[in-house]
Amino acid sequence: MAPNLRKSHPLLKMVNNSLIDLPTPSNISAWWNFGSLLGICLATQILTGLLLAAHYTADTTLAFSSVAHTCRNVQHGWLIRNLHANGASFFFICIYLHIGRGLYYGSYLYKETWNTGVILLLTLMATAFVGYVLPWGQMSFWGATVITNLFSAVPYIGQTLVEWAWGGFSVDNPTLTRFFTLHFLLPFMIMGLTLIHLTFLHESGSNNPLGIVSNCDKIPFHPYFSLKDILGFMLMLLPLMTLALFSPNLLGDPENFPPANPLVTPPYIKPEWYFLFAYAILRSIPNKLGGVLALAASVLILFLAPLLHKSKQRTMTFRPLSQLLFWTLTANLLILTWVGSQPVEHPFMIIGQLASLTYFTILLVLFPITGALENKMLNY
């Protein structure tokens, strides 16, 4: 009998072991769909990004016009641009839900998979930031100025660091050129990191909603979860297309419609919605260095999740106290996102400071204490 090519061919064998014959826990819920949705987001962003890059000119005098030209004169250029801009929003929606799932179900106990995931998040944030600068609108220019300026808070080498990043004494042509280079390069880095992320995941196998070893009850990935993933793709691509076709500027900032003008400061400077929670944490501390450290800590704190797990149970499925904390944290992040979009005045300042304090308190103090308390309660 001839050998099955799918199982014997060196390349097809890898695909088979990752996507077809992969043993998967039978009880994973729709929360496990977001990994594959992130894969689709990445593929969509790279495809639309390549098509946009073909018509883009990384020069301060031409960047804005080249984007306008793409939207007006290139076949379906408007659609490609709208899909790319709104695809970024969907990318972040999926990654935040994916991280939330990981925190709720204790997936962070697969330390290597979790750590590569956090590195992926940081890379994605960097990619989105440099990408936002490329259309060279007002908010692109001033956003780049404000955020790169944060590096000047680094003691001793800060100012040198900023000028090195800018390629001059202000955000100008060299900055735009290098940001375009980075925006082109980073998605391919994300692809590489994704493969590492999956390699680590397939070493241990997927977690499941009960958080128990499921080796005795696994089913092949195909056709069960491949079909479930395709349903997920359709359910995500439908709202993405709806947003891109009917309301493409809903999530954008109207301040980015005028071309960049270094002589006119916009009335407010704020990032895209997916960075607002971190921006609110940055603004809540009146000291520049303190704000930058809090901003960095707001994301880097995820690296500590495995160390702060004190419960004997892996998931929060049967831990009502931890569940209450988790949903409080979720509400807290939504409050931070809202505060980040508001002007720096009373009462938003104090709300932002309280929400920032709550964010760190829940993650660093209350989660471990609650885990230990629930262990005690199990003994009674």
UniProtKB/Swiss-Prot annotation:
Binding site for heme b b566: H98, H197
GO function terms (MF aspect): metal ion binding; ubiquinol-cytochrome-c reductase activity
The entry's keywords: Electron transport, Heme, Iron, Membrane, Metal-binding, Mitochondrion, Mitochondrion inner membrane, Respiratory chain, Transmembrane, Transmembrane helix, Transport, Ubiquinone
Cofactor(s) this protein cannot do without: heme b
Residues binding a ubiquinone, per UniProt: H202
Pfam families: Cytochrom_B_C, Cytochrome_B
Binding residues for heme b b562: H84, H183
One GO term of the biological process aspect: mitochondrial electron transport, ubiquinol to cytochrome c
Keyword flag Manganese: no
Signal sequence residues: none
Domain of life: Eukaryota
Cofactor binding notes: Binds 2 heme b groups non-covalently.
Presence of keyword Heme: yes
Family matches, as Gene3D superfamilies: Cytochrome Bc1 Complex, Chain C
Gene Ontology annotations for the cellular component aspect, listed alphabetically: mitochondrial inner membrane; respiratory chain complex III
Transmembrane segments: 34-54, 78-99, 114-134, 179-199, 227-247, 289-309, 321-341, 348-368
Family: Belongs to the cytochrome b family.
Name assigned to this protein: Cytochrome b
Gene source species: Anthropoides virgo
Gene assigned in the entry: MT-CYB
